[in-house]
Amino acid sequence: MAGRKGGRAKRRKVCFFTANGITHIDYKDVDLLKRFVSERGKILPRRVTGTSAKYQRKLTVAIKRARQMALLPYVGE
């Protein structure tokens, strides 16, 4: 269990919002928000999605607002 042998180096994930030039995350854009929520309804962490800390905070607020407005479910299907 000391280390990986012959494994590839992990590629750094690029922030989706910085790459596409998105500065404002709208809570009404449900299709965009669904990409960052698991099938169980949980917000995916940064290490999984690759978003920067700045946009992860904005994304979390937008998802919580969308849930409050009943645009997104609190729990998955």
Curated annotation (Swiss-Prot):
Entry protein name: Small ribosomal subunit protein bS18
PANTHER family on file: 30S RIBOSOMAL PROTEIN S18, SMALL RIBOSOMAL SUBUNIT PROTEIN BS18M
InterPro entries reported in the protein's UniProt record: Ribosomal_bS18, Ribosomal_bS18_CS, Ribosomal_bS18_sf
Sorted UniProt keywords: Ribonucleoprotein, Ribosomal protein, RNA-binding, rRNA-binding
PROSITE patterns reported in the protein's UniProt record: RIBOSOMAL_S18 (PS00057)
GO molecular function: small ribosomal subunit rRNA binding; structural constituent of ribosome
A GO CC term attached to the entry: cytosolic small ribosomal subunit
Any single Pfam family the record assigns to this protein: Ribosomal_S18
Record family assignment: Belongs to the bacterial ribosomal protein bS18 family.
GO annotation (BP), single: translation
Tagged with keyword Chaperone: no
Described purpose of this protein according to its UniProt entry: Binds as a heterodimer with protein bS6 to the central domain of the 16S rRNA, where it helps stabilize the platform of the 30S subunit.
Assembly, per entry: Part of the 30S ribosomal subunit. Forms a tight heterodimer with protein bS6.
